Structure formats: structure tokens, C-alpha cells
A protein has these predicted regions:
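Acidic, His/Gly-rich catalytic cores of divalent-metal-dependent hydrolytic chemistry
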Residues: 155-211
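A structural micro-motif
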Residues: 1, 49-51, 141, 177, ...
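N-terminal active-site segment of His-dependent metallophosphoesterases
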Residues: 1-49
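Short, electropositive, low-hydrophobicity segments enriched in small/polar residues
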Residues: 11, 19, 39, 60, ...
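Beta-strand-turn-beta hairpins that frame and shape the catalytic cleft
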Residues: 1-4, 81-88, 172-179
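Glycine-rich phosphate-binding loop signature in dinucleotide/nucleotide-binding domains
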Residues: 23-28, 83, 136-139, 198
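Conserved catalytic scaffold of divalent metal-dependent phosphoesterases
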Residues: 41-144, 148-158
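Active-site neighborhood of phospho(di)ester-bond hydrolases with catalytic His/Asp-centered motifs
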Residues: 6-7, 30-36, 53-57, 89, ...
Length: 211
């Protein structure tokens, strides 16, 4: 199956429409949204696309600005999703077990430092190492994330090193552990064009693309 995985729309409805139209042209069969959606118009497009979503840091503070229907949608979002062969999150899949949706986080805001829940993975940092270890222990080869507004990928090598990948097309090899940043639809910080990722789970191939 071929998926489009996108994140960080930040109220940019036109950019999201470009991504959705571009993805359809690529023969995409399913969508995932990794948070920081923004206004009601953008939420409506995500929901119309049938895209399972996770919440990002925008939703943590921005959900009260949505319509009542979309507030309920946002408050029910999880911080990460575990599919059969890949995981998806806004920033990290390592969350306290009692925080299973945005409403739980809102009820426990004083007890949870948000900086730990929304790390930036575009450089080699302790959070990235912790995620790689967690993926390896779970025998999970692939994580997609947003939040950094940059397209990039890291591979955990057999000799326990982190390798930053520079290609826009990446093949998931047997034994690999990959962390892939899909970039930003609405506010990319690594060049022009609305950025997102395509993943073909039959070919085991990731493409970092722009609409």
C-alpha cells in the first residue's frame, strides 16, 4: 500500500490542498497526519481525507480555537500511532503511559514538562538515541515524525552508530532502524514547497517529496 504522511500544516489551507492533490497523483491509497494542523478549514481537509492523526504541540494550546466538533476531534487524538510495520508521532513516541490522548495531557499539564514530549530530532541528541533504542527493542524498523519542519532521515547502523541520510529516496533494508522526518506542509524550514513523505510498504521505500 502507498501512503502519504504529512505534518505541520499551521493554518496553510492552500499548501495542504496542494499536498493532497499531489499525493492523489502519486497513486496514494492512505494518509496519515502528524499534527500541528491549525484552523478548522485545515482540520476539515484532514478529516475528509480520512487521515488518522496524532496531536502536535499546536493542538496542545490551539484546540480551544476550533469549532466544538473539531475540539472533540482534537482532544481525542493520541500522541503516537503504532501501525503493523511503522510508528507515527509528532515529535517522539516515548510518552507516559497514562497520557493516551490530548485530553489526558490537558488534565496533567502541571506534571509533564512539554519540552521533553516535543524534542527536535534534526540533530543527534539524547532523545533521538532513546527513540532508536526503543524502536530496536520493539523490533520496529521505522518511525515517521514531524515537528522539526525539515525533511531528513536517520539510520541506526549495525555497529551502533547514527547515520544521517541525505537522499530523498530511501529503501528500508532488512535489519534497518530508520527515523524519518517528513517535513512541513505549511512552514518548511529547509526550502520552498509543501513537504511530505510517501511510503510504499510493499517496496519498503520512502520518498521525501514536495508539492
Amino acid at each position: 500500500m502507498r501512503y502519504a504522511i504529512f505534518s505541520d500544516i499551521h493554518n496553510e489551507t492552500r499548501a495542504l490542498l496542494k499536498v493532497l492533490n499531489h499525493a492523489r497523483e502519486q497513486g496514494v491509497e492512505g494518509y496519515f497526519c502528524l499534527g500541528d494542523v491549525g484552523i478548522d478549514d485545515c482540520v476539515a481537509l484532514v478529516r475528509e481525507a480520512g487521515a488518522p492523526a496524532v496531536f502536535g504541540n499546536w493542538e496542545v494550546s490551539g484546540w480551544p480555537h476550533l469549532s466544538p466538533e473539531n475540539q472533540a476531534w482534537a482532544l481525542g487524538l493520541p500522541p503516537f500511532r503504532k501501525e503493523a510495520h511503522f510508528w507515527l508521532t509528532h515529535a517522539t513516541p516515548l510518552w507516559p503511559t497514562h497520557l493516551t490522548r490530548l485530553a489526558d495531557l490537558n488534565a496533567n499539564r502541571r506534571d509533564v514538562p512539554l519540552s521533553q514530549l516535543f524534542p527536535y530530532l534534526h540533530f543527534e541528541c539524547p532523545a533521538l538515541w532513546e527513540i532508536m533504542v526503543s524502536l530496536t527493542q520493539a523490533n520496529m524498523p521505522l518511525l515517521f515524525h514531524g515537528h522539526t519542519h525539515r525533511q531528513m532521515a536517520w539510520r541506526f547502523t549495525a555497529d551502533n552508530h547514527l547515520q544521517k541520510l541525505s537522499h530523498s529516496r530511501i529503501r528500508l533494508r532488512p535489519g534497518d532502524t530508520l527515523v524519518v522526518g517528513v517535513g512541513s506542509v505549511g512552514r518548511p524550514e529547509d526550502g520552498p514547497g509543501a513537504a511530505y513523505a510517501l511510503y510504499d510498504d510493499t517496496l519498503k521505500q520512502i520518498e521525501l517529496v514536495r508539492a
